[in-house]
Amino acid sequence: ANKRILESVWPGKVSVILPLEKSSLKKFEYLHRGTGKLAFRLPRKKALLAYLKKSGPLVAPSANPQGEKPAESIAEAKKYFGTNVDLYIAGGRLVGSPSTIIEIANDASVKLVRQGAVRVKYVTPSC
């Protein structure tokens, strides 16, 4: 079921929060900061996909600190993150809706965390 959901939203502007396996909790604690979950995204932009095919997975923060509006330019991103980010890639001004964020639980239920650019149809109402 999870594979079907992921195939329906990727590539695109949907971030998916998934629970980590117990064996990975300690190893990735610096990333999940005690939540036991990580968010993943598969972008649609061909240039970025080509880069990722060569580099492998990329660990990156959102384009904004939690609760702040998403950065629309490198200048805004640098105000948020400064030298804490190793690489900024100029992609022009980014205008539009932020990504949709969903969370898939261990029981395969899907919770809408943030409605964004993409409407998701697999959301479990009881979450």
What residue spans do the PLM features occupy?
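Active-site-adjacent structural elements in enzyme catalytic cores
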Residues: 1-127
